[in-house]
């Protein structure tokens, strides 16, 4: 088993990540993310059923989720609970490295009607903190121990000595125990209101992903999310810190970057396919978000 170098995150129309982490028999993935290799320079909005810990190795990062932005420095760790919509990007574009550890919680907990799941997993997964941050220092309770366990997992995952599957499972269980003990100090557990916001957000994003190349109104988007225009805008601001229009623009630009890199379509065609009203409008928006024109972007690939 090898540590994988990732360079993109593939998602479906609901922003659920489509990649399988590890294997059916051993659902654990360990990735070294070097952001100089990433196609868009960052990890875009996504969610997954697995647990994730990101461990910052080099550079500084911003992790956005549910209305929060967490500034992460080398040696710091962030735990992201299952089902949480998040994205992460380096403060300095294209510079930074982190390890991502992603695993299926049922791999550790066993059956949902078993004692281990009910005692140590059910509350944390269903109503526990959406994220936790720890510093890998002796002064940070739990942080140093989690960092040591993650370092051991990287070595086991890449070198696979005898019994390494069992050793990794034991280390992940120790990490989970430490996270449970931190949980009492963690902010923002899941509430019915946040659960409702998350469902509306995913419905709206699903529609945007399926129709970003078309023109549609805010009213239509709100209908798809089963709410009103004003409430949808408040939901986006609470959860993502931006209005729906801004999220749609970012997504259109992301898709345009992919087409500019991976297709022979003209710039006018890329503009049309990604929902821009004209090539000039596309060019000005692309310059604002990416820092260069579409033509310059393609030339520098």
Spans of features found by a protein language model:
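A hydrophobic/aromatic-rich effector-binding and dimerization subdomain
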Residues: 2-34, 82-155
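Conserved short histidine dyad/triad with adjacent acidic residue
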Residues: 30-48
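Short, conserved beta-strand element in jelly-roll/cupin
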Residues: 46-63, 79
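Histidine-centered divalent metal-coordination motifs
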Residues: 46-48, 86, 281
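Short acidic-glycine-tyrosine-enriched beta hairpin
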Residues: 67-81
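An amphipathic alpha-helical interaction segment
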Residues: 126-191, 196-199, 203
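Basic/polar phosphate-binding segments, predominantly the helix-turn-helix DNA-binding elements
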Residues: 177-185, 203-254, 265, 269-300
